[in-house]
Design a protein with these regions (language model features):
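Extracytoplasmic copper-binding redox domains, predominantly the cupredoxin/blue-copper superfamily
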Residues: 25-186
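Bacterial N-terminal signal peptides that target proteins for export
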Residues: 2-11
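Short intrinsically disordered, low-complexity segments
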Residues: 6, 17-19, 98
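Bacterial N-terminal signal peptides
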Residues: 11-21
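Extended alpha-helical regions
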Residues: 1, 21-23, 96
Length: 186
């Protein structure tokens, strides 16, 4: 399936999701609970609504920056490595066991914040590096996979990650797989 068709299908699905809600989205006031602190991760992109929505349909990209976004041709030119304005910030985070991680989507597109064993491809083959590389197991079959569906972040939403055990945990966006970070739990 061509990249344009894959993204168009995702766009249609995402428009439906925006209208109906999602799994795994939490409303959090940013307070610490009895177990630890809340550490924030910001999920960012800078899509240009005119070119993204023109190609894939309304709602795929919202103008959240109020300024000029990255036009779709520039985004596509950055593939397969991925565009640097699509990222998790910070790229690494050190927390204490018992802390909660709050991933907040401040970008214009929908993303996932999915824990993976190893970094690799997402569920849109044309966005992988190398192109058409297989998805990592946690990202296979897109939103039909509960690991993906439960970690979906629509624009403006947040997701809480709790009970991380000691060690290094890897998170990636299953749509834009160059969006990656590591969380070290001490």
């Amino acid at each position: 399936m061509a990249l344009r068709e894959q993204l168009h299908r995702i766009g249609l699905a995402l428009v439906l999701v925006v209208g109906t809600g999602t799994l795994g989205v939490a409303d959090d006031k940013g307070r610490a609970d009895e177990h630890g602190r809340i550490q924030q991760v910001v999920v960012l992109d800078n899509c240009d609504p005119t070119t993204f929505n023109g190609a894939f349909g309304p709602g795929i990209c919202l103008n959240v920056t109020g300024g000029q976004g990255v036009p779709l041709p520039d985004f596509l030119a950055a593939l397969p490595a991925g565009h640097p304005q699509w990222l998790f910030y910070p790229a690494t985070l050190s927390i204490t066991r018992g802390d909660t991680v709050r991933a907040v989507n401040q970008g214009g597109e929908i993303h996932t914040f999915t824990e993976v064993e190893e970094f690799g491809g997402g569920f849109i083959p044309g966005l992988n590096d190398p192109p058409n590389a297989p998805a990592v197991p946690e990202c296979t079959v897109g939103y039909a996979n509960i690991s993906v569906a439960s970690t979906r972040l629509i624009q403006g939403s947040s997701l809480l990650v709790t009970d991380l055990q000691q060690g290094v945990h890897r998170f990636e966006c299953c749509i834009h797989p160059w969006m990656r970070m590591e969380i070290e739990v001490q």
